[in-house]
Amino acid sequence: MAARRGRRDGVAPPPSGGPGPDPGGGARGSGWGSRSQAPYGTLGAVSGGEQVLLHEEAGDSGFVSLSRLGPSLRDKDLEMEELMLQDETLLGTMQSYMDASLISLIEDFGSLGESRLSLEDQNEVSLLTALTEILDNADSENLSPFDSIPDSELLVSPREGSSLHKLLTLSRTPPERDLITPVDPLGPSTGSSRGSGVEMSLPDPSWDFSPPSFLETSSPKLPSWRPPRSRPRWGQSPPPQQRSDGEEEEEVASFSGQILAGELDNCVSSIPDFPMHLACPEEEDKATAAEMAVPAAGDESISSLSELVRAMHPYCLPNLTHLASLEDELQEQPDDLTLPEGCVVLEIVGQAATAGDDLEIPVVVRQVSPGPRPVLLDDSLETSSALQLLMPTLESETEAAVPKVTLCSEKEGLSLNSEEKLDSACLLKPREVVEPVVPKEPQNPPANAAPGSQRARKGRKKKSKEQPAACVEGYARRLRSSSRGQSTVGTEVTSQVDNLQKQPQEELQKESGPLQGKGKPRAWARAWAAALENSSPKNLERSAGQSSPAKEGPLDLYPKLADTIQTNPIPTHLSLVDSAQASPMPVDSVEADPTAVGPVLAGPVPVDPGLVDLASTSSELVEPLPAEPVLINPVLADSAAVDPAVVPISDNLPPVDAVPSGPAPVDLALVDPVPNDLTPVDPVLVKSRPTDPRRGAVSSALGGSAPQLLVESESLDPPKTIIPEVKEVVDSLKIESGTSATTHEARPRPLSLSEYRRRRQQRQAETEERSPQPPTGKWPSLPETPTGLADIPCLVIPPAPAKKTALQRSPETPLEICLVPVGPSPASPSPEPPVSKPVASSPTEQVPSQEMPLLARPSPPVQSVSPAVPTPPSMSAALPFPAGGLGMPPSLPPPPLQPPSLPLSMGPVLPDPFTHYAPLPSWPCYPHVSPSGYPCLPPPPTVPLVSGTPGAYAVPPTCSVPWAPPPAPVSPYSSTCTYGPLGWGPGPQHAPFWSTVPPPPLPPASIGRAVPQPKMESRGTPAGPPENVLPLSMAPPLSLGLPGHGAPQTEPTKVEVKPVPASPHPKHKVSALVQSPQMKALACVSAEGVTVEEPASERLKPETQETRPREKPPLPATKAVPTPRQSTVPKLPAVHPARLRKLSFLPTPRTQGSEDVVQAFISEIGIEASDLSSLLEQFEKSEAKKECPPPAPADSLAVGNSGGVDIPQEKRPLDRLQAPELANVAGLTPPATPPHQLWKPLAAVSLLAKAKSPKSTAQEGTLKPEGVTEAKHPAAVRLQEGVHGPSRVHVGSGDHDYCVRSRTPPKKMPALVIPEVGSRWNVKRHQDITIKPVLSLGPAAPPPPCIAASREPLDHRTSSEQADPSAPCLAPSSLLSPEASPCRNDMNTRTPPEPSAKQRSMRCYRKACRSASPSSQGWQGRRGRNSRSVSSGSNRTSEASSSSSSSSSSSRSRSRSLSPPHKRWRRSSCSSSGRSRRCSSSSSSSSSSSSSSSSSSSSRSRSRSPSPRRRSDRRRRYSSYRSHDHYQRQRVLQKERAIEERRVVFIGKIPGRMTRSELKQRFSVFGEIEECTIHFRVQGDNYGFVTYRYAEEAFAAIESGHKLRQADEQPFDLCFGGRRQFCKRSYSDLDSNREDFDPAPVKSKFDSLDFDTLLKQAQKNLRR
């Protein structure tokens, strides 16, 4: 009423929304509660189209917007619009004043309100007055809303989701007096309220009237509502709802921005999806201008409206004043809403109930005539920035995209308020922007949807006016948004911007004063107009400054945001309106320019109005990208991660359409650029989940860049952005409206929706399908990260180029999304240098940079909907951690080699940014880590967060743990790193991260020779990258394998080390490996070569060649175990797993030096705990240690050699599976176990030992054998060197091979080996032991040539390893020949026989007889070493003896029988410390083996291992049982002591209903009770015992305990316990009860383990 009075007095209501004539018009002076919020203004006060928001108590979500469209309503002073109608009051009063149909409508509305709308009696009266006025004014020209509504419809019960529709505009102002009624003394807001007919937005869905956009636009007098017209209610059959001209009713709904009744009704079916808030008057203006630029005049609009009403809701029809009339109004009432000639103002009424959930806002925007761009509402409008929703011509659109907002410029103040409303209603959860053409984000901001919806309604009114013509031409854009405080970014942004602009503009505020309370749609439009007018940031800032004052309720937050934005000189965000205006690529410009970012990326906007505002601001920023991308305020910056997006919004933006908004990625994110006649600006399916403010914010930020662009388009000025598309939108709205506003999300109303979906599907196909729909914080990206590792690279790679192309093609938009994430700048021509470098981008847009990661994530979504769009954006949006979520994809870092290709693949959405960032792949974070060392791996994820694109890299941390090893390798391959991003679809994130982690690329540089090729391979040769990918996938499981497989990461390290030893050859080979799967093998070989040095190098060459062929096939397999082995063997003597381990030590130290150590650390990270535990616990563990170290070496090699070694090793394990290798592995397993079993245990051990690759048993097995082989080879070399050969040569010495291997490293690189093993494997203890012996042994066997030769044989052990000149021949025969064992024993013969020794190992496994002498020699040698090497030495000794043993099976069995006992005993004795136990078991093993054949010893070891384990387990159990018995005994003693101390009180005659706790509670009054028990007996009294801490308390209980009984209870029988309690346990009741409550001490479990005991116990239980 205050607003009414203010209007009458010509006083603008206070912007504060106070009860006085403030924007809220007193109707809702203080809050959203019963009165329309001040920010919305007294809806009635809004000129053009006032919206009375019947705001639910809930707030934004529910409110009825009475849109007073025509000046007539304004003139009639429809103050009731500003009033909030209470359901009950409204119904009662209405019933008294209205006919049944009207009452029914109201009732429906009330039902919608669900008593959430608390309407004051005043409001009721106002509403009645407005209705009366409408009815009175009804004439042939101005149909009564009710006239156009069939009685049946009027009587129809409210439908769900049609509350906005039910909020029917009671009257429609004449077109000339439509939304824009300069007459309004208070300004557009007040004037429009007065001038416009009452616009009743009834949330009740049953109101079939489409939102009275006509109300907004048309005067209430218009007889738009014709009862005769039976138009299917939106809710019922949106598709059938068409105007007589055939246009879909949806169009009308869009025109009736408020869609009060109509939209509410539509909401039932289509409106629900098509929330009242058409959201963008500007859009309407655009579409209307373009489509309906020619629309005849108000007359046509009226007729069109009638038709529309027929198709849509009658109430809508009046609102749909023809654009011409609307334009007339604009001219006549510039203050009210100065829309460009082609502009349609959408007034959207947030429907409290419907809007809360999902509202689609059909926005019909006429494209502004190119010429009339300044057709801003008026000079007065211009005066009022908000009013001046300039409908920029195409030419000026670029300059002032905001002008489109003119639609909303109905009221500047209102514009803000309206915008808010729109934000609440219109932007309420726009699930999808059905409008392919309309890139209006208004739908996005759900928080502000209600205010935005009002404004949209107003826009729609005008739109409705021009709708007749424009409807068909333009698409009605439906934005589904939840009206409960969730606004799409676009709308919210608009409202925010509007508020910012408008608030600074007092005149605008005056105009929108009443509306600002609740009917902010017009204020929003006005704000847009003002923003357009003040295209410069200062206007925006000023607006922001004033915005906060103007917006009180929900808008308050926006003002704050706006203020912050405004505070920040960067109008970019703020520029959503202003900057958009100022920026060459404003929404209008977008519309005008096909390049304009059609897709509104404001995807899920935070429910939080503030967030929404931020998002909106960000969107705005995006659109006005030319303005400073600098985020206006941190919050804005966050939500404005969009800022980067802003950049892409440049004219080049057109392609950006596809870019989905961060969270928006849900679905609408990538609405195709609508190829509508206007700009291809596609309506982004702004399917935002405002419910999650954080998500919304994130999506704002996340979508910041791209979403921002879109959001700016959409949120900036949904109409503005949409305006170009308005035509399409209108059409779409009609069609969609017909289809179903409710199902708007489900049904692609406009092409843009279809396109969007199509694109989304494509993106999903390209990248893992990440439903954008769950943008809220899911970590789909995380889940996808694991799956995407291998898959994404391939999938992404092909799509990436295409997407990239598309993104590049429209870098503006993609960058908008991608820009931030991937490097908006690179991807987008839209100049945002910062984008080009994520870091730079973040500097440019400090907050945006932060947001950028978020956006970056959305960008990946853009790349591939599945990868990041849905989840990543949401994650991104949800939290900076999204980077973590994306981080998962960063896990991909392992496949850095592929990143080059991956960047492409990764960049389905981000390809461009990614490509730009390719150097800065998401891996950069990992590279960053890599430089530090594998241990740093986890940091990279953090680093990315730190980096300019923290959000993007929040995810990498996610995977960082699993991928820690890979990341290190990745560092060398900076560009390759993109692979991970690609696979993960966090590419954008990665890219930013890379920018942050350019240093990692340096490592690649150091490894330059290997790295470049790996990159090439990853990019050019999918096979190679696939290898990487597979290893990467496995990488988390096996760091070694990963490094090996992920040559990129591991390889670089290796290469670095490698160059020193065998740099030339390894380089060449590494290159080859990089180029092809061989690369990995080569890398490994080269690393090995380095380790072996010259001999190794020579062998490496042939081996590499062999390995390549083999490895290549295996690589594709992800890890052909045999091939890896072969590869490994060439690199290292791939004789036995143990040998390999040894070799690992040597080569690893040599080859990888620090790199290897780093790799070891990585492995350590993943494997340390498990490996140690498994190895330590079992003798196998010690063997596992050998194996693990080999894998570690393998990893090291992989790292040093470009990951080739690891992969080969991993594959080699298959070869190693051969008896010899298995024998080596046997160290882990008891000698008795078959080679396969050995292998399996090895795998298990490896799994335990290294978390890296063992995840896959096969991988583990292969890796482990690989490692074992390497270790063994080194061990063999050492043995040969030290003449320990015999003991070491035999395969059976697999257990001890690790010792031998240790030896070899000392010779080559003992120090490195030790650190590597220790750091890398958490086998530190093992390795320490091994290393020590190795060091001592190393000197013993110093001859490097010997090592080389030995290595060859060892490698030969895997037949391919024999690639070495001599080894090849020997391999087959020697494997089978038993002579190898002696050779092994003898250092001289060792080299040639070594292969035979390996073979012999195989035989040993086969249990083939072997010469005893070699065995004994080996055993002796090993034994000596064992004493030196302790556990590792002994293990190797036993291994050697077993391998060299040629004794018969009988001796074997004998040794088995002897050895296992010793071993077991030793083991059990040493069980306390894994190392000691290992040593002792090894020693015992070796001693027993020495006494018996090595073969028997080997088998013995196998059998021994398990049995000691069993023993130790048994011992543990015994000890545990003993401890349990001890505990029980202690309890008994304690009880006895308590009894003796008289602290136990016996309580007899306990009632049966009493519980122990109750008893304890009763008697606790006497003191602290230590124990309380109750014993129930079938016969006799129940009794219990209470043990007090002190005897005095027990005495007190006995003396006074009887007083505790209740009246209905018998007195307790109290005495000191012990008398009966501890009588002989002959009392069965006592006994059983005691066991029940107090289990008797259990005898040692062993006693109960034997059958007799168990049987007795069972029988005893049965007897009980």
From Swiss-Prot:
Residues 1543-1619 form the RRM domain. Residues 12-22, 823-836 have a biased composition (Pro residues). Gene3D superfamilies: 3.30.70.330. Residues 1096-1113 have a biased composition (Basic and acidic residues). It is found in: Nucleus. Transmembrane segments: none annotated. Residues 23-32 have a biased composition (Gly residues). Residues 1379-1450 are annotated as: Necessary for interaction with CREB1 and NRF1. PROSITE patterns: RRM. SMART domains: RRM. Residues 201-224, 522-531, 862-873, 1365-1383, 1427-1459, 1468-1500 have a biased composition (Low complexity). Strongly expressed in heart and skeletal muscle, moderately in lung, placenta, intestine, liver, kidney, spleen, thymus, colon and brain. Also expressed in several oncocytic thyroid tumors. The keyword Repeat does not apply. Residues 482-499, 533-549 have a biased composition (Polar residues). Residues 433-467 are annotated as: Necessary for interaction with CREB1 and NRF1 and for transcriptional coactivation. Interacts with CREB1 and NRF1. Residues 1-44, 167-255, 436-555, 681-701, 735-793, 818-873, 1045-1068, 1093-1130, 1182-1209, 1334-1528 are annotated as: Disordered. The gene is PPRC1. The keyword Ribosomal protein does not apply. InterPro entries: Nucleotide-bd_a/b_plait_sf, PGC-1, PRC_RRM, RBD_domain_sf, RRM_dom. This is Peroxisome proliferator-activated receptor gamma coactivator-related protein 1. The modification Phosphoserine is found at S237, S536, S548, S1076, S1411, S1413. Induction: Up-regulated by serum (at protein level). Keywords: Activator, Nucleus, Phosphoprotein, RNA-binding, Transcription, Transcription regulation.
